[in-house]
Amino acid sequence: MTAYIQRSQCISTSLLVVLTTLVSCQIPRDRLSNIGVIVDEGKSLKIAGSHESRYIVLSLVPGVDFENGCGTAQVIQYKSLLNRLLIPLRDALDLQEALITVTNDTTQNAGAPQSRFFGAVIGTIALGVATSAQITAGIALAEAREAKRDIALIKESMTKTHKSIELLQNAVGEQILALKTLQDFVNDEIKPAISELGCETAALRLGIKLTQHYSELLTAFGSNFGTIGEKSLTLQALSSLYSANITEIMTTIKTGQSNIYDVIYTEQIKGTVIDVDLERYMVTLSVKIPILSEVPGVLIHKASSISYNIDGEEWYVTVPSHILSRASFLGGADITDCVESRLTYICPRDPAQLIPDSQQKCILGDTTRCPVTKVVDSLIPKFAFVNGGVVANCIASTCTCGTGRRPISQDRSKGVVFLTHDNCGLIGVNGVELYANRRGHDATWGVQNLTVGPAIAIRPIDISLNLADATNFLQDSKAELEKARKILSEVGRWYNSRETVITIIVVMVVILVVIIVIIIVLYRLRRSMLMGNPDDRIPRDTYTLEPKIRHMYTNGGFDAMAEKR
């Protein structure tokens, strides 16, 4: 059965390695480097979705029950130092407790002593709106309420025992570690010294040790005692202070050794002071240990860009700061809330983000879809470290090689130049001198005819990419529109032409002018005729439409006729 389990683990590990290799190979890092895009090998992804709770009860004053009050004065002085350290912390906890309304309290026996401890289930915040800090603090208090009885019992037992370490597991499986500081020193050195060296000498040794312990206490828990918020625990200081292996707290964590390493490396073990007991000089800390779950087959790559040259112009490719690659997915990664260890990214949720299709194809090696912007200033990076060497744009920069500062001439058919320790030991870029790694190899992937996408603005990237696609579409449709316009102009009739319209307008204007001239001539002719016959006399032989009878009346025609009769 054991062999079968080991074989299954080996097979799963091999599949994971193969899958990780395939995911890493889908990004052509060599081709992208030719246009100044630098992509690292990537790190795995782990999700910290939940945590385990631990509690540490610190007894800061050792149990001293010497005869004749030996060492009492030194202990009193030591307590005064602790008061100056712990009283402000206790007052802050009291203020925090006052902001939380108790909605569900437990009943206790009337005769039982009321021990001072935070015990409340979160209800409403006194001022109405709960901030995230208040909610976090309230959750810590509510969780501490569940362990109240167990912690109270171990605090009571610590006052009655002379052991330096007590370990208790409560009903829900949460460990409570009790550290009684300096108790071993008192038991092993101070008590024997009283009988050998006398009370005064032993008391002096105790005072020196207490002062030293106070300094070590500030070193180990200074960040935790200085605030009521969450702070990372200093594991090394805690281990050396109490002569114990602090990793014992994590013995029941259901996780692997690599996860424990990542948690320690990123300082994700947080401690919060939840109780200060000035009567017993005990401090209780709530410790949160995150539980990590690795997402198989996922790598997060860190990406960056430097400028490169093509056709005598300097360009810059815009890429996401982090790229998440999965078997069938390639996108961006928002690591704002993530922490980075040496091998992994630890995130509270899946950081995957969608990126435009053109940017995906660019990262996969199709440089014709890469969104670029033209460099107009010197703020764009000109060099970067890759594969133990340096990749630089030596056309837009002044590059030198070796201790003799030999100038580097970059081929204009190449976008960038790759420099390593083999071909250039001391590398200089714009006056900055760099030593390449001796283990770096010469990154020569050959000269490629590079073609990139349309120029865009860097901010915002998504909008610019959409505008770039729209620009390509408009450029393609412009030629088709020109062809359609020519066809329409050829198919149209004669009166649709521009020359015909102009001719018609000119003819109409000429006709209008002629009509006006004719009217003026007729008007002047009639006026001249009226001026030539002022008496309005008309000759007899002149043809007129007026009746002849009128002339008969006017010329005496009727009178002559009457005489004849």
From Swiss-Prot:
Effect of residue 47 to V: In Mutant KD-21 and Mutant KD-52
SUPFAM superfamilies tied to this protein: Head and neck region of the ectodomain of NDV fusion glycoprotein (SSF69922), Virus ectodomain (SSF58069)
Coiled-coil intervals, chain numbering: 142-170, 466-491
PTM comment text: In natural infection, inactive F0 is matured into F1 and F2 outside the cell by one or more trypsin-like, arginine-specific endoprotease secreted by the bronchial epithelial cells. One identified protease that may be involved in this process is tryptase Clara. Unlike most paramyxoviruses, Sendai F0 processing occurs on the cell surface and induces a conformational change in the protein that unmasks the fusion peptide. F0 maturation is a primary determinant for organ tropism and pathogenicity. N-glycosylated; glycans consist of a mixture of high mannose-type oligosaccharides and of complex-type oligosaccharides. Glycosylation at Asn-245 is essential for membrane localization and F0 cleavage.
Entry-listed glycosylation sites: 104, 245, 449
Phenotype for residue 347 to S: Inhibits transport of F and HN to the cell surface
Primary localization: virion
Subcellular location: Virion membrane; Host cell membrane
Protein name: Fusion glycoprotein F0
Species name: Sendai virus (strain Z) (SeV)
Gene that specifies this protein: F
